[in-house]
Design a protein with these regions (language model features):
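N-terminal amphipathic, basic helical "cap/leader" segment at the start of enzyme domains
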Residues: 1-92, 186-249
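C-terminal helix-cap and adjacent tail motif
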Residues: 3-13, 25, 160-205, 314-336
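Short, basic/glycine-rich phosphate-binding loops at helix/coil junctions
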Residues: 6-7, 95-103, 187-189, 249-259
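Structural motif
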Residues: 94-97, 135, 162, 248-251, ...
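Short, electropositive alpha-helical surface patch
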Residues: 149-161, 302-315
Length: 336
């Protein structure tokens, strides 16, 4: 697959043809999407999905989705036809995939699990696009209701990640511009020099991939990401020690922290999708990419020296090139 082309061409689609999406197709998309993510991770599965494909199942899901509106003051003021229209849109959609992640016993574990399911959802969207299937990633706050949680069987220790509504598209929505990665890019301590020239890990090659990767889904086109590249000097040495990784260079992918918790969660998911795009694109490069979420990124004092701002957080540290081993580090400093 030409990942660059698919990533750039994929669109969020809200209107679908009446052609059904076969269960076998959905199963194949899920299996391949999970495999693509596992190729970069430890293979552990901390997520599950539910498929609403039959008319009865779609009606049931739609009822749970509008339950919060109907029971609210706003719902009592809205015309019945408007609520019926919202329900009809959900029931007419050929299929819905609900994704759920395990919460985890620590913030780091919860983030790792959520990042995994978001990455898999992005893979599903990209793979589906190649088959002519468009999707909409839905996380509206109207889903925050007891009726919806009962319908999807949300358990204690689980977290709702989103719904992928899907169907074959007849018309491709127009493209919406993305901000070039260069405008959200900072280099600390210089570029790669000599350390890995033979592996071609340079700021230029990383930026080329990022300018494709930024075509990730993000609500309201907030583009909540920023990139900090450490290709040499003290910053790269410090990251090698912190990560226990003899990488040629590092890319810190940072998310802006919104005050609104719902936006904050949506933005984190968007950055995870961008990172997944980057990893898929980098698979054709001569240098490997290792996606890590080490413990130190949760300590603001460790993040400050790399230029992470007060209202930002590191979503992942991407180790670029090298073999992943650092003889200067003790085993306890390695990510497990």
């Amino acid at each position: 697959m030409n990942w660059s082309k698919t990533i750039r061409e994929r669109r969020s689609v809200r209107r679908y043809s009446s052609r059904p999406v076969a269960q076998e197709t959905i199963d194949s998309l899920l299996n391949e999407a999970a495999h693509l993510y596992r190729a970069e991770g430890d293979g552990a599965s901390h997520w599950r999905s539910l498929c609403y494909r039959t008319p009865e199942a779609r009606h049931r899901l739609a009822d749970s989705m509008i339950a919060k509106i109907k029971g609210s003051t706003l719902g009592k003021l809205l015309p019945g036809k408007m609520i019926d229209l919202i329900k009809k849109q959900a029931t007419d959609t050929p299929a819905h995939l609900v994704f759920i992640a395990e919460s985890g016993s620590t913030q780091r574990q919860s983030d790792e699990n959520y990042a995994a399911v978001c990455s898999i959802m992005q893979n599903v969207q990209l793979l589906g696009w190649e088959l002519g299937i468009g999707m909409l990633w839905y996380t509206d706050q109207i889903l925050n209701s007891a009726a919806f949680e009962r319908e999807i069987g949300l358990r204690e220790g689980e977290r709702f990640a989103g719904i992928l509504s899907m169907g074959y598209y007849e018309k491709v929505p127009r493209a919406r511009k993305r901000t070039p990665a260069e405008q959200k890019w900072t280099i600390v301590e210089g570029d790669v020099s000599g350390y890995a020239d033979h592996l071609q890990v340079s700021s230029r090659s990383v930026l080329a991939l990022l300018n494709d990767a930024v075509w990730a889904p993000n609500d309201g086109l907030r583009e909540p990401w920023r990139f900090i590249y450490a290709g040499g000097g003290e910053a790269a040495d410090r990251l090698r020690a912190l990560n226990g990784d003899a990488a040629a260079a590092f890319l810190l992918v940072v998310a802006k922290e919104e005050s609104d918790s719902h936006k904050r969660e949506e933005d984190y998911a968007a950055v995870c999708c961008l990172i997944q795009n980057f990893q898929l694109l980098a698979a054709s490069e001569p240098w490997p990419v290792r996606r890590t979420m080490p413990e130190w990124i949760y300590d603001p004092e460790h993040c400050k020296p790399f230029g992470v701002r007060p209202q930002e957080r590191i979503v992942a540290v991407l180790a670029l090139g090298g073999d992943g081993r650092d003889s200067r580090s003790t085993p306890s400093s390695k990510k497990t």
